[in-house]
Amino acid sequence: MASKPAAGKSRGEKRKRVVLTLKEKIDICTRLEKGESRKALMQEYNVGMSTLYDIRAHKAQLLRFFASSDSNKALEQRRTLHTPKLEHLDRVLYEWFLGKRSEGVPVSGPMLIEKAKDFYEQMQLTEPCVFSGGWLWRFKARHGIKKLDASSEKQSADHQAAEQFCAFFRSLAAEHGLSAEQVYNADETGLFWRCLPNPTPEGGAVPGPKQGKDRLTVLMCANATGSHRLKPLAIGKCSGPRAFKGIQHLPVAYKAQGNAWVDKEIFSDWFHHIFVPSVREHFRTIGLPEDSKAVLLLDSSRAHPQEAELVSSNVFTIFLPASVASLVQPMEQGIRRDFMRNFINPPVPLQGPHARYNMNDAIFSVACAWNAVPSHVFRRAWRKLWPSVAFAEGSSSEEELEAECFPVKPHNKSFAHILELVKEGSSCPGQLRQRQAASWGVAGREAEGGRPPAATSPAEVVWSSEKTPKADQDGRGDPGEGEEVAWEQAAVAFDAVLRFAERQPCFSAQEVGQLRALRAVFRSQQQETVGLEDVVVTSPEELAIPKCCLEASTET
């Protein structure tokens, strides 16, 4: 059917062909989603009805280009989304350019042309192509490259672009009927898990070799409600850490990479073999059809493959523009901060008998910190991008969540209740003298809202000598019942039991995590009872018994 003539034109007058810029097309999509009149838009932009329908049909492609563009200037200049003839060469060259820019290496126009010629020869292409100044201009316009100086990959925040992207995202969610259970965000963060300062002699430096700064990259992913948190992916430098030898269950997925960074191969493997199966399993659990749609929101990073490679049936990805990610990406709106606050990273000196904090302890700490982030933090993190999700829950549920985060610990409970408390213990052994631990513990309590530790720990019910069962009236007790066990002996026994459980398949990952939590509570009680400066404590947070470590080895 022929489109109606634009408003203001007579039937006999032929309308002049108008080719809108990509920015104008995006504005039209946004205004259509807001419910503005089609006739008013036809008159304003001097286009026909068929043009409006065509623009709306290509909304997804417009969104992808908007997400990958370097600046709004590309949207104002470019009018079509036509792909180049040598599409594979164009994609490889653009990825090379992004890599150099992220490294801070300046890339000039002649350098880009020479690299394009090199790729052309390496790919053994036969289709003629002239790598001229015009070709360079079209390449920059095609990818929205504003400058080639590439001083940094980090882009300044663009509030106008953020508003446009938010409008697109909400319309996309409405178009596909997506709920908060079906929308995910993933992001990476680096952890130097041996990097905290070490207790030093007053007025002097630490003797011995320099303290190591072992690095982990952690990939975290969760949906908008926080009800589905995937097991974190930890990337280290070593393919087979000695600390993992014989371990039956790990609370995280682990991959090795030379620089402990996420690369495209690792991310693609995570997407197809961990993310997609986990999402479908979650859908089965909550009663959604397995073929329900799911969206993964990512920032623009050279470690992430192209969108076309991150698709599996009804599971697809959307990239945030570089100038928008810092403003609206959910992981940057409180989730990462809460995770880092929960992460326990004690100082571990390279000398002394207690230098046992290893990779295994670090990844258990990662799992504890990740599972400790309250659900309401996830919902609130989407308030800028998707306000309807952030305020979907009532105030009563928020109060319940606060109660879950900061439980009030009773002083006199049965052993069954104590075991429930034990799940909240920490799992990061280290060495810290009492003075440093006390000062660090004050800072930790201030970070948690100024909640001081209780005067009496519930763990005293278990370990207090006053509660120890007495021998029978006839003086005959069980074998070994009259022998006192020193704190140091008990600590060694705890370590031995934990090492044994970690290497036995009959113990589940959750049970191993609970043993670690129990050991943490024991060491906290040891610190309070013995009161010696050289007593080993697991972390400053344990002076107040950490609020979380519940099911560190399972997905919530």
From Swiss-Prot:
<keyword id="KW-0238">DNA-binding</keyword>
<dbReference type="Pfam" id="PF03221">
    <property type="entry name" value="HTH_Tnp_Tc5"/>
</dbReference>
<keyword id="KW-0539">Nucleus</keyword>
<dbReference type="InterPro" id="IPR004875">
    <property type="entry name" value="DDE_SF_endonuclease_dom"/>
</dbReference>
<dbReference type="GO" id="GO:1990904">
    <property type="term" value="C:ribonucleoprotein complex"/>
</dbReference>
<feature type="domain" description="HTH psq-type">
    <location>
        <begin position="11"/>
        <end position="62"/>
    </location>
</feature>
<dbReference type="Pfam" id="PF04218">
    <property type="entry name" value="CENP-B_N"/>
</dbReference>
<dbReference type="InterPro" id="IPR050863">
    <property type="entry name" value="CenT-Element_Derived"/>
</dbReference>
<feature type="domain" description="DDE-1">
    <location>
        <begin position="213"/>
        <end position="382"/>
    </location>
</feature>
<feature type="region of interest" description="Disordered">
    <location>
        <begin position="439"/>
        <end position="482"/>
    </location>
</feature>
<feature type="modified residue" description="Phosphoserine">
    <location>
        <position position="414"/>
    </location>
</feature>
<dbReference type="Pfam" id="PF03184">
    <property type="entry name" value="DDE_1"/>
</dbReference>
<feature type="compositionally biased region" description="Basic and acidic residues">
    <location>
        <begin position="467"/>
        <end position="479"/>
    </location>
</feature>
<protein>
    <recommendedName>
        <fullName>Jerky protein homolog</fullName>
    </recommendedName>
</protein>
<feature type="DNA-binding region" description="H-T-H motif">
    <location>
        <begin position="110"/>
        <end position="142"/>
    </location>
</feature>
<dbReference type="InterPro" id="IPR006600">
    <property type="entry name" value="HTH_CenpB_DNA-bd_dom"/>
</dbReference>
<comment type="function">
    <text>May bind DNA.</text>
</comment>
<dbReference type="GO" id="GO:0003729">
    <property type="term" value="F:mRNA binding"/>
</dbReference>
<keyword id="KW-0597">Phosphoprotein</keyword>
<feature type="DNA-binding region" description="H-T-H motif">
    <location>
        <begin position="38"/>
        <end position="58"/>
    </location>
</feature>
<dbReference type="GO" id="GO:0090263">
    <property type="term" value="P:positive regulation of canonical Wnt signaling pathway"/>
</dbReference>
<dbReference type="InterPro" id="IPR007889">
    <property type="entry name" value="HTH_Psq"/>
</dbReference>
<dbReference type="GO" id="GO:0003677">
    <property type="term" value="F:DNA binding"/>
</dbReference>
<dbReference type="GO" id="GO:0005634">
    <property type="term" value="C:nucleus"/>
</dbReference>
<dbReference type="InterPro" id="IPR009057">
    <property type="entry name" value="Homeodomain-like_sf"/>
</dbReference>
<feature type="domain" description="HTH CENPB-type">
    <location>
        <begin position="77"/>
        <end position="149"/>
    </location>
</feature>
<comment type="similarity">
    <text>Belongs to the tigger transposable element derived protein family.</text>
</comment>
<dbReference type="GO" id="GO:0005737">
    <property type="term" value="C:cytoplasm"/>
</dbReference>
